[in-house]
Amino acid sequence: MEKHGNYNINKICVIGLGYIGLPTASMLANHGYEVVGVDVNEKRVNQIKNGELKIEEPGLLTLVKGAINSKNLNVQTSATEADAFIICVPTPALENEDGSKKCDLTYVMGAVQNIIPFLKEGNLIVIESTIPPEITKKIYETIDKKIYVAHCPERVLPGKILKELVENDRIIGGINKKSAEMAKEIYKSFVEGKIYITDSNTAEMVKLMENTYRDINIALANEFAKICDEIGVNVWDAIKIANKHPRVNILNPGPGVGGHCISIDPWFIVEKTNNAKFIRAARELNDNMPAYVCKSVLSELKKHGIKKPKISVFGATYKGNVEDTRESPSKNVIEMLLKNGVTVSTFDPHATCFEYPLSTLDECISGSDCIVVLTDHDAFKNIKKDDIDEICPKLKNKIVFDTKNILEHNLWKRAGFTVKLLGNGAW
């Protein structure tokens, strides 16, 4: 194995082989490092060994197979000795009694404990998992060995992970300068974007700021949508025109915010301080959008005198063209509809695992009173006249509620549908 850089880091142990860990481990292996990928899920490890991925990500299977075939990547269920350890495990949110949330560090601290027996003096630990400020230092303080620790938060978008792993800028924060420089040595092997060096607290805060900014922007759009519903304005048209201003960039409204980052990360700031009232308000507004959508749909059904309705939900994933359902607003919308006595059937062309049963398209629309679009999959955007003509005979009533503004509304109207759009009070 060739020597990499100035710090004799040749063998890397990556803990966690999910959406971030597996691509990172494979990327490093394909760039000459000896990599051991570790995951406590034995089934996942065996699937990776057999070239069977449950992660729907363009190019990932080819990358993983190349890494394994090169003999640079081995996957197993337990940690091992290495020169550097990269932790890529989930940091979900735990709900507090007051409805706020805080970071669940169970998986991160568990990963740290699992690698401690294998640590040698001079080793490096890199935390990629998103964590609250001051946690990297806390991890360093729990280890009674002379090692180096850095935080290099992941910054990739599902569906574009491999492209963004290479092209995106990265931030690396060390508990000291050498920790950051050692981590930079690893990442510059495949990162073509700029790598910014700072302290660990700043790196932690930067990642949280990035996603909090987007969450607040979406909350603003969602509040505009509610206002426009009330005063008779199409929020989508208004946002489009407002964004013509060179210093305005309002994001789109929707049924809520999901995924493993934007819907969770702002809470990691809120838990650290009482000065995050604006951040908390935005988070709560976005969390309440599923209830607003549910109320709007039920109101429309009531106008049509529909009792004991069946609703077809289009979309279970948290965003378009991915199979990831984590923190998806669809789950909350469905839960609220069910509590109101509605029969719900869900169709998603990408999702394979969801909290509620997934149906085929025909099963989903059969006898339905209303179609509610919650995810902006291309499969839904590309519904054409012939598709609508096939759908119509299977429905009981023709109502469609578009929360993402992706349908060709005129096509549906010409087919006899009542079309409702989130945030369009002009209709």
From Swiss-Prot:
Matches recorded under Pfam families: UDPG_MGDP_dh, UDPG_MGDP_dh_C, UDPG_MGDP_dh_N
Residues binding UDP-N-acetyl-alpha-D-mannosaminouronate: R155, V156, K207, N211, R214, H245, R247, G258, Y318, K319, K404
Keyword Transcription regulation in annotation: no
Higher taxonomy: Archaea, Methanobacteriati, Methanobacteriota, Methanomada group, Methanococci
Family: Belongs to the UDP-glucose/GDP-mannose dehydrogenase family.
UniProt-annotated binding residues for NAD(+): Y19, I20, D39, R44, T91, T130, R326
The protein's assembly and partners: Homotetramer; probably dimer of dimers.
Summary of the function given for this chain in its UniProt record: Catalyzes the four-electron oxidation of UDP-N-acetyl-D-mannosamine (UDP-ManNAc), reducing NAD(+) and releasing UDP-N-acetylmannosaminuronic acid (UDP-ManNAcA).
Enzyme class, broadest EC rank: oxidoreductase
GO biological process, any: polysaccharide biosynthetic process
EC number: 1.1.1.336
UniProt KW keywords: NAD, Oxidoreductase
Catalytic activity, as annotated: UDP-N-acetyl-alpha-D-mannosamine + 2 NAD(+) + H2O = UDP-N-acetyl-alpha-D-mannosaminouronate + 2 NADH + 3 H(+)
Key word Oxidoreductase present: yes
Native organism: Methanococcus maripaludis (strain C5 / ATCC BAA-1333)
Descriptive protein name: UDP-N-acetyl-D-mannosamine dehydrogenase
Molecular-function GO terms, alphabetical: NAD binding; oxidoreductase activity, acting on the CH-CH group of donors, NAD or NADP as acceptor; UDP-N-acetyl-D-mannosamine dehydrogenase activity
Active site: residue positions: K207, C261
UniProt xrefs under SUPFAM superfamilies: 6-phosphogluconate dehydrogenase C-terminal domain-like (SSF48179), NAD(P)-binding Rossmann-fold domains (SSF51735), UDP-glucose/GDP-mannose dehydrogenase C-terminal domain (SSF52413)
Domain of life: Archaea
